């Protein structure tokens, strides 16, 4: 039975990843910040672990709990949009977005990626097309854009570090999805996005290590 790790599974894309992988017979390890969310994930059949991605001690504790695991696929989903205005960001707003979207990845990927080496597994982060510099046509959401561009950089560093060990690391844009962040007017349901993301990750080959991909598997400019 293959094993998948989903970091940030309390709702939205992460929660649907748990549901779909379990439906396909995978063993699922999933994290959430609140115990109530962990209890719900456990009811779906996942091994649920509490994790606050903004807390270094919590991340270190996760590493201990995952010791000796061999994982076939891992998804880093946890993220926040931050302020909807494009004015002067406060220090608190900056820290919330950058700590959640960037610093967490810098701390988590070195813990998670080695667990994929034995299986020559695949590690994916949920980024956003808004983080693309080459395709940027609007300055809206500047703090979120900056955080996702930085996340993509962290992903490439992981690809360079762990690719030689057989791990394939990729960054995905999930599409405009009907989640709390995307809103009800988004073009994709959570089910549609996750179905495509899973299929695209399954199709990724090691030669694509370090790629930035759309949910349908097509490349996105950095």
Model-found features: residue ranges?
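C-terminal helical subdomain
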Residues: 164, 171-174, 183-222
